[in-house]
UniProtKB/Swiss-Prot annotation:
ATP binds at residues 302-309. Belongs to the phosphoenolpyruvate carboxykinase (ATP) family. PROSITE patterns: PEPCK_ATP. Its EC number is 4.1.1.49. Signal peptide: none annotated. This is Phosphoenolpyruvate carboxykinase (ATP). The keyword ATP-binding applies. Keywords: ATP-binding, Decarboxylase, Gluconeogenesis, Lyase, Nucleotide-binding. Pfam families: PEPCK_ATP (PF01293). It catalyses: oxaloacetate + ATP = phosphoenolpyruvate + ADP + CO2. GO terms for biological process: acetate metabolic process; carbon utilization; gluconeogenesis. It is an enzyme of class 4 (lyase).
Length: 600
């Protein structure tokens, strides 16, 4: 080398792109953007390629390693991780960004919550629920209208259909979480979905693992949500383009033909209704639960729309959970990491805890908002009556976290929403009456909680959970009877429905302030000491007075204003109770049967 010659030292990083390379680079960036990929992934790819030439400016990309999660998805579901961007356990902010960019109907509301649209299905589709009929669970499952059987062959067809759909997406989301706050019984759940809205929903509803727990997370159950794509209608047993199917042997759930996020939540619930009693002798409950300052626990049974979420959000008591629980030999634990509250008619005055929980990180579902101010109109039911919000349970100021109690319930409240207006607002139940009304599960099907329901309809739902049950109702009922007997709990029938008359004959919904006053009297012990009278036909024990509640409201006969005969209406409902109970009478004791109404 000649003295004084300049020595060229190449840069440590990749060389500066020449014009041809630069054009290629920009073209690929644009192509990735059009295909909804993250352009940062391409920059990394181009920067790490080797053997770049003028003819082949992209060079050769070394084979990249895959994460443990990606390898599991590839092995079990054949997810093409080299083509599909697998976004695993993303942050709330990242899910907001993707939902806003890629999902129609998504916006940030004035409170900071994300609002999403679930499409044509704005409620659950119970008629499309299927359980795979296979050897390991066949003798346990309660087969019939609630749990329709699906053959393993049809399962495989629809499962592959869901996986094929997910493989056509440019990005899919994976959310890992736990169901059950008691570590002795919790199950690990993985959700694989195509919508950021669904991912954020389940991030809120499952119990969020720590960073350390996520490192080597292995799911017990996997949910494949391909809800944007229809089921194969021509396979055996399919009645529509919607399919919500669970396979207890494969430990998987597949959703097709519905984007309603509540299907995932209730699918996990059905899994727990199977796993807990069968494998652990633990009772699963469709209930909310809270705890007083003295450690006393109250459990609220009830169907959607009867007030479980609203009534358990009590500023004077710590919230254990609003919808799904298990009762063990040690106490009660919440299944979920979040709450899924109805929003229709919501206001800061009536339900401040829920109203204030709707903020950044929460997911509003099918609400209507002002396009300028982004303020949500909670009274607007244009899209559905079943407007909802999913938020982490920590958003409730007085939530008890971890969400479990070492105390056994001292008060068990069976919630009902009587559209006929003939059941008392509150009744004290004997053990036998508790069994009768638990097995009956009477309420009125509330507008919007299921697809196609717009007016209240009288219905019976065994264990207040019939759409979610996996086993025969009497199996849960016997377990509850044992718990009540063992722990000497007080039981109450609380009607949050109509008073004065029926829903169609001029009655009005029982004001929330009176329902809360009744609960306060239960928790203080005053109501248990009150003077009672017998309410005819149903033979219920009704208090003559309750602090904060008008006396005439406590006995429906005294507050009846409808032109129809009160006696006729009571007896009509009594007949419906007795007709429904015939389905379970062969497995019920004489004492429980006698605890039902006597038609006069």
């Amino acid at each position: 080398m000649a003295p004084g010659a300049n020595i060229h030292i190449p840069p440590a990083g990749p060389p500066e792109p020449g014009p041809l390379y630069s054009d290629f680079y920009q073209q690929q960036i644009e192509r990735q953007r059009n295909n909804n990929y993250h352009s940062t992934s391409l920059r990394n790819m181009v920067a790490t390629s080797v053997n770049r030439t003028a003819l082949h400016p992209g060079g050769v990309q070394p084979g990249k390693g895959h994460t443990e999660l990606e390898e599991e998805l590839h092995e079990h579901a054949h997810i093409d991780y080299d083509r599909v961007a697998i976004i695993a356990n993303p942050s709330v902010a990242a899910l907001y960004e993707d939902a806003l960019v890629y999902e129609t109907g998504t916006a940030i509301t004035s409170s900071g919550a994300l609002t999403a649209y679930s499409g044509a299905k704005t409620g659950r589709s119970p008629s499309d629920k299927r359980i795979v009929k296979e050897e390991s669970s066949e003798k346990e499952v309660w087969w019939g209208p609630v749990n329709k059987p699906m053959t393993p062959d049809v399962w495989r067809i629809n499962r592959e259909r869901a996986v094929d759909y997910l493989n056509t997406r440019n990005r899919i989301y994976v959310i890992d979480g736990f169901a059950g706050w008691d570590e002795r019984y919790r199950i690990s759940v993985r959700v694989v979905c195509a919508r950021a809205y669904h991912a954020l929903f389940m991030r809120n509803m499952l119990i969020r693992p720590s960073a350390e727990e996520l490192k080597h997370f292995h799911p017990d159950y996997v949910i494949y949500n391909a809800g944007s794509f229809p089921a194969n209608r021509f396979t055996e047993g399919m009645t529509s383009a919607t399919s919500v199917a669970i396979n207890f042997a494969e430990k998987e759930m597949v959703i097709l033909g519905t984007e309603y996020a509540g299907e995932m939540k209730k699918g996990v619930f059905t899994i727990l209704f199977y796993e807990m009693p069968v494998k652990h002798n633990v009772l699963t409950l469709h209930s909310s639960a809270n705890e007083g300052q003295n450690g006393d626990v109250t459990v609220f049974f009830g169907l959607s729309g009867t007030g479980k979420t609203t009534l358990s959000a009590d500023p004077k008591r710590a919230l254990i959970g609003d919808d799904e629980h298990c009762w063990t030999d040690r106490g009660v634990f919440n299944i979920e990491g979040g709450c899924y509250a109805k929003c229709i008619g919501l206001s800061a005055e009536k339900e401040p805890d829920i109203f204030n929980a709707i903020r950044f990180g929460s997911v509003l579902e099918n609400v209507v908002f002002d396009p300028i101010s982004r303020v949500v109109d909670y009274d607007d039911s244009t899209l559905t009556e079943n407007t909802r919000c999913a938020y982490p349970i920590e958003y409730i100021e007085n939530a008890k976290v971890p969400c479990l109690s070492d105390s056994h319930p001292s008060n068990i409240i069976l919630l009902t929403c009587d559209a006929r207006g003939v059941l008392p607002p509150i009744s004290k139940l004997t053990t036998e009456q508790t069994m009768f009304h638990f097995i009956s599960g009477y309420t009125s099907k509330m507008a919007g909680t299921e697809d196609g329901v717009t007016e209240p309809q009288a219905t019976f739902s065994s264990c207040f959970a019939q759409p979610f049950l996996a086993l025969h109702p009497m199996r849960y009922a016997r377990m509850l009877a044992d718990k009540i007997s063992q722990h000497k709990a007080n039981a109450w029938l609380l009607n949050t429905g109509w008073v004065g008359a029926g829903a169609t004959t001029g009655g009005k919904r029982c004001p929330l302030k009176y329902t809360r006053a009744i609960l306060d009297a239960i928790h203080s012990g005053e109501l248990a000491k009150a003077e009672y009278e017998t309410y005819d036909v149903f033979n219920l024990h009704v208090p003559k007075s309750c602090p904060g509640v008008p006396d005439e409201l406590l006995n429906p006969k005294n507050s009846w204003t409808a032109t129809t005969s009160f006696s006729d209406e009571v007896n009509k409902l009594a007949k419906l109770f007795n007709e429904n109970f015939q389905k379970y009478a062969d497995q019920a004791t004489k004492e429980v049967i006698a605890a039902g109404p006597v038609v006069q």
